[in-house]
Amino acid sequence: MAVGKNKKLSKGKGNKKRAVDPFTRKEWYDIKAPVFFENRNVGKTIVNRSQGLKNASDALKGRILEQSLADLNKDDEQAYRKFQLRVDEVQGRNCLTNFYGMSFTSDKLRSLVRKWQSLIEAHQDIRTTDGYLLRVFAIGFTRRRANQVKKTTYAKSSQIHAIRKKMFEVIQRESSSCDLREFVAKLIPEVMGREIEKSTQGIYPLKDVFIHKVKVLKRPKFDVNKLYELHGGASVVGAEDVGTKIKSGEFKEPVPQASV
């Protein structure tokens, strides 16, 4: 057997490199929701500090954040609605967000499905007045008529087609004549769902009619002034970072002191 050094038994190096906590290189930023939500302080997000050519604001822009409407509007009954917010601008330590979508939680959608009824779904692409292309998804369920004895409430195919056509008409009418801010204002109290329920009474009575999902397919060219309007104006957003201009004639040279 050859005599040699056993590599497995060799001693390791005495000076090991000390592990650096990665959180020492990171910073926390506040997330601000648009003004159409009651609670504008959504939370915080973390990012690596600006270093060299890498800017922290560039890493933050484009982040998609998901928040429950119960936290945004301080209403626990709306916990099943999830709103997506996209970071479009960074001012100081504040991330200014804009609406980027909405969806229902899976447990809420599953709780709506029942036996002995018909499920009717529809989706349509609409364009707001300020250039956003949105895909709106609606859902509804048939219910019993007044004094109905029959257990089932199945709708015929012709009735389902007629109800879906009414859904298209209501979504187009309520969405195409408003901008994104007005659209979200209609989305939160479920204005379109109630309109669909009213307009389809003559075809077949519906219940649990909701706009359960909204996707942003296309956004207009980014305008920072419009984003500031969604956050209460530029002077409100960056109040802590903007100084006051000194007018000419206000500065007075201090009187020199005799002793220090």
From Swiss-Prot:
Component of the small ribosomal subunit. Mature ribosomes consist of a small (40S) and a large (60S) subunit. The 40S subunit contains about 33 different proteins and 1 molecule of RNA (18S). The 60S subunit contains about 49 different proteins and 3 molecules of RNA (25S, 5.8S and 5S). GO terms for biological process: translation. Keywords: Acetylation, Cytoplasm, Ribonucleoprotein, Ribosomal protein. GO terms for cellular component: cytosolic small ribosomal subunit. Disulfide bonds: none annotated. InterPro entries: Ribosomal_eS1 (IPR001593), Ribosomal_eS1_CS (IPR018281), Ribosomal_eS1_euk (IPR027500). The modification N-acetylalanine is found at residue 2. Its main location: cytoplasm. It is found in: Cytoplasm. Belongs to the eukaryotic ribosomal protein eS1 family. It comes from the Eukaryota. PROSITE patterns: RIBOSOMAL_S3AE (PS01191). This is Small ribosomal subunit protein eS1. GO terms for molecular function: structural constituent of ribosome. Pfam families: Ribosomal_S3Ae. It comes from Malassezia globosa (strain ATCC MYA-4612 / CBS 7966) (Dandruff-associated fungus).
